[in-house]
Each structure stands twice: as C-alpha cells, then as structure tokens.
Amino acid sequence: MKNLFFNLKDLKKLGKNSIIGKTVRIRYPELVSIGDNCIIDDFTYISTRLELENNVHISSGCKLIGGKKSQIIMKRFSTTAPNVVLAAGNDDYVSG
C-alpha cells in the first residue's frame, strides 16, 4: 500500500498484515515500530517514538505527539477512539 506522506520502507519495523491509511502522517518514520495485524486509520498524525505491539488499532484522526526523545507504547489488543490525542513527554517547568 502506498502512503502519500512517507515511504513505508523508512519505518523501523512494519509487521505482517498491518494496514496504514494513505493519509497517515509520520514525522519520524525511522522511530516507529508497528507489530503484526495493526491498523492505523486515515488522518492520523504521529510525531514521536512509537511502538505498537501486535493487534493494535489507532482510529481515524488521532494525534500521537511528543518528539524524538519521548515514546508511546501501545500494548497488544489496545485501541483508541477517533480523534484522540496521546501526548508523551514531561512538563517539568521547575528545574534548576
């Protein structure tokens, strides 16, 4: 399957029988690992290190954000509702 915004070959890992919608945008595909039998629906945006275990479904319009240093891990058989925002990172503004 062809994607409009990145080359599937650039993904860190793409498991068997996984489906990625044509309009999914992945900012750092080299940091994204997708297990077997996963589905990422159209209009999803990913801009963080991501690991999807087997049988994960990300619904349409979701945003998984956090940058290169943060990570989101979705365990097997997990799912999101449409338009969910998952943000990884640390908002520690009190340091020094």
Descriptions of predicted regions:
Residues 1-31:
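Extended, small-residue-rich solenoid/repeat segments and analogous flexible loops
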Residues 22-34, 39-96:
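Flexible, glycine/small-residue-enriched loop-and-beta-strand segment within the central core
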